[in-house]
Amino acid sequence: MTQTRVNPPACIFCTPDREILAESPHALAFADAYPVSPGHTLVVPRRHVATVFDLAEDEYSDCFLLALKVQELLAARHAPDGFNIGANCGEAGGQSVWHAHIHVIPRFAGDTPHPRGGVRNVIPRKAAY
């Protein structure tokens, strides 16, 4: 699923202006600029590629291992009741920044009236099953 869209020369994820919460050989983690919950964090590969599907196997593995570390940090800091993890890939998938990234989103009891379905809610009529 290689995307042809190119970020402007100053990619906001290639040169993040936020505190790095955690890092690994192939990835960085920092707070989302527009968090949907307290602690919402992005795991971003160091190499500029459009989507997580464009990552080399070692980069992909490293990103998800860093996401696990981030989950542990967020659990200790925020004591959430659950998590969502995911990546928006392609325009139809909701991607708005054309540098691959993984969202790690702490979830709290009561933050939405009907949490069942989780990420399935991206298509509301398909959330219930």
Language model segments and positions:
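HIT superfamily nucleotide-processing domains
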Residues: M1-Y129
